[in-house]
Amino acid sequence: MLTLEQIALAVKGEVVGDPAIQIISVDDINEAAKGSITFSFLPKYKTKISSSNASAFVTDSKDDLEGYNGVVVEHPYLAMIKILTLFSKNKDVQHSIHPNTVISESAKIDSDVTIGPFSVIGDDVIIKSGTIIESNVVIHNDVQIGRDCLIHSGVIIGADGFGFTTIDDKHHKIPHIKSVVIGNDVEIGSNCTIDCGSVKNTTINNSCKMDDQVHLAHNVTIGEGCLISGGTFIGGSATIGAHSMLGGKVDIGPHVVTGEKSVFAARSCVLKSVPGGQMYAGNPAREIKEKQKRDAVFTKIEILEKRLKKLTKNEK
């Protein structure tokens, strides 16, 4: 339980209303009750302040809180992160390795690493300080994981990539002799699969964040600070430029190189390399303005087709 004043101090915000009001939970604005604090900085939530049962609101404008208790902040999402952390049950992580974990004797794991039950850590794996590995994670031989990473349940890192050559209808497996290197401050969502490299390491650079069920094929390189949404598949030897954003179920083809700060809309299919600093959408993925022009052409064709049918019908 915290007072509104304590919360305001934590987020460097300004109290509006009663600073001594007691806050016991953080809730959605539609479900908030007495004792709740909620977030109302988006326009669609500002209109719900008057009908909400919350005791306090976090917003970016003092005008929103006339007659209500709340905290005004300059950066609402940073305040949201801080407040959720204050009320999180997991804020005090106990660093430990569960006894049901299987760890190779040759693995090098820093003392303050946390590993959950039924995880498997292979030969010569390196895991650096502050990293948390949840339950049922498999980390294959030679994988390197940097500091302060979070690996969610069900992740498999370092399994063989999908590489075959076919001669006379027989498939010959290509050996994968490299591994996976993960930088610092990386988060990998549940049930992601990251294949090891064949001739070079699969690499995820610092501060990348991956949603659930993302697949990285062999030899992939993910630049620093990328955000990758769920269901995305990145083909072998592809390179994603730093600080790029990939929406849900994006497909990146093998050997494709994307420039820095690219944005790919959900379900984009990227079949060839593209420059950075632009937004892409569609299948095949095109720069968004080009795609919109093409879509407009098809719309006009449909309109003309309907007119033509109407004229033909009238002639009959």
Model-derived regions, located:
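Structural signal for interior beta-strand "rungs" in well-ordered beta-sheet cores
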Residues: F39, S96-E287, Q292
